[in-house]
């Protein structure tokens, strides 16, 4: 899991793309959280939701390669499936909630496109079945 986050989050940070803080590994400014409207509980991925809202309010984010934080991984396949279901549902909830705001911003086409792909990444699975 560490390798995945190093590559994904590092690339997002390095390229100025929207990135998400993982619930167990974000260091937040209280002012940024308040400015973005605080924690919302209308999505299953409140950390993803807050990450995007903070950036939509022009707060800067950065991935720190040299900071190590422990995290818990699912202990069995059922726990993994449950985690992935929450992440999939929450990502799509966040996409429905925030992509209209992303599209209205004065961001580059690439940044908007990548945000769309990032928030809708779990849609690949049903699309594979359909196609």
Regions found by a protein language model. Give the residues of each.
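Membrane-embedded multi-pass helical conduit in multi-pass membrane proteins
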Residues: 121-131
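Long helical/loop segments within the catalytic core of UDP-sugar-dependent glycosyltransferases
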Residues: 1-44, 77-116, 120
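AAA+ P-loop ATPase motor domain of ring mechanoenzymes
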Residues: 70-73, 77
């Amino acid at each position: 899991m560490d390798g995945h986050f190093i590559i994904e989050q590092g690339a997002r940070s390095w390229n100025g793309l929207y990135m998400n803080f993982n619930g167990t590994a974000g260091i937040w400014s209280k002012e940024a959280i308040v400015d973005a409207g605080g924690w919302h509980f209308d999505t299953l991925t409140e950390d993803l939701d807050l990450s995007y809202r903070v950036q939509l309010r022009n707060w800067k984010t950065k991935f720190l390669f040299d900071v190590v934080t422990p995290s818990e991984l699912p202990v069995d396949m059922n726990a993994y499936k449950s985690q992935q279901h929450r992440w999939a549902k929450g990502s799509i909830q966040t996409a429905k909630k925030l992509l209209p705001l992303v599209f209205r911003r004065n961001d580059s086409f690439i940044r908007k496109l990548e945000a769309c792909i990032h928030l809708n990444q779990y849609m690949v699975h049903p699309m594979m079945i359909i196609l």
